[in-house]
Each structure stands twice: as C-alpha cells, then as structure tokens.
C-alpha cells in the first residue's frame, strides 16, 4: 500500500506537469481534460484502491476467547493481463496498479496511442518503490501480444477497458482455452456505452445546452461516458435547439497547446474517417 500512496504523491506533485503534458501532446487532450484525468483521477484511483484493499483485509472472522481466526488473501496463481485504452491515462495506472497492489504479477499492454503517458506511469511506480518485474509493460502488435498471453498456462486473469467487441473476443478465446490454464481465470472488463441525457420540461435550456455540449464534445466525444443521445420534451425543443446551434458555432478547435481551444484532434486517422462517414450519412 505504501508504494501506491507514494505513487499518488508523486503524480500530485513532481510528475503532475509531465504526465499532463504527455496526455495533452500524445492523446490530444485539452489542459482541463488532462488535469482531471492524468493527475486528479489517477491520484484518486491510487488512493481509493489502497482504501479498498484495507477495507477488504479488515473484514475478518470473529475470534472467541483463546482463539485467533485470521483470513488471508493470496494473489492469483499466475499473472494478470491488463489491457488499457488510449482515452484515460488514469485507467492506465489503475488497471495494472490495482492488480499489483493485491500481490499479482502483471503483464500490461497499453494502447499504441497512449505509450508516452504510459511510460511516465511506469516511471512513477518505479520511483515509488515498485520492484522490477511486478508490472511489465509490453508494446507491439496487440493481436500477437494477446494471443501469446492467452495461450500461456500461467494466465490467471484479465483486467480490461476497451470496446465491447474486443472484450467479447477475449472472453471467447479464454473460454476456448480453459482446459489449458492452471486455474480458472478472473475476467474483469469495462466496455463501451451509449450514454443519454433526459431533460424535463422544466429544464433551463441554457444549462441544458451547456450540459449537452460538454457531455457530447469534451475530448471529442472519445469516452464511454460521452452523451450519445438526448431526449428533449417537445415543449422546450425549439428553444433548446436554437441555443444549442448557437453555442456549437462558438466552439474553438485546434491544438491542445492553445488553452483557449475546447476541442482538439481525434486520436487517429481511422477515427476521423469514421466520423466523416457518419456525418455524410446524416446529411
């Protein structure tokens, strides 16, 4: 626990500017989005995980007079495979870190588009005192790495954040290989969402338009929590859409190095092409 509390101190202090800058430059987040993710949320994850671990260990069976009952926890019998996405630097510290905190050896595959800040996360853990070989970052072809990992008899668990389709494929392959493993792997995953906003007819349309714009377009909508649907009562729809269109026209877009920009670039060319196709279909 002390190692990860120290890591939280390092992220909040001497590494704060570096991890924010890496998230801005390599993942194209604005300064605000980088700060609430790479610094604030990562610190929260690290501290909350320590709190949760202490809570788990505190849940002990009763000990009567002359008897001391003690419940201990062992790591999994093998290694944990952590797979993290590009869109949250905090998740890249949380998924491998929480598994390591409970005594597991971790093979960690960061997103190809998040390698810069992932390297800084590793540097933080190392400076905090994490021994070499506990969290092992592996870069390269995702399919090759995953197939190698899931074919190992020592694979004992997966900690995943990413798309629903990829997670289903991983689950299916693990099931196919179940006879080859030394134990039953733990499968933990967080996947995509289709979040929505529901407005009441008493809603303030100024506040509502702001909420929709921020929910849909912050970090270019590249979050599972991004607002993808909005349900508006007919009684306020005209006023709302007029204000929404007016505010959307004011959005500034450009480099994250300009702190006045609200939006920046999407993560890669394929993402851009997908959005262009969706817009063309909508027309």
What are these regions (language model features)?
Residues 12-16, 50-61, 179, 250-253, ...:
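Proline-centered turn/helix-capping motifs that create local helix->coil transitions or kinks
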Residues 52, 83, 141, 161:
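Conserved residues at the C-terminal ends of beta-strands
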Residues 58-132, 206:
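Conserved small-residue-rich beta-alpha loop and adjacent elements
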Residues 98-100, 149, 179:
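Hydrophobic/aromatic ligand-binding patch that stacks against planar heteroaromatic rings
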Residues 124-129, 151-153, 157, 164-283:
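ALDH superfamily catalytic-core signature
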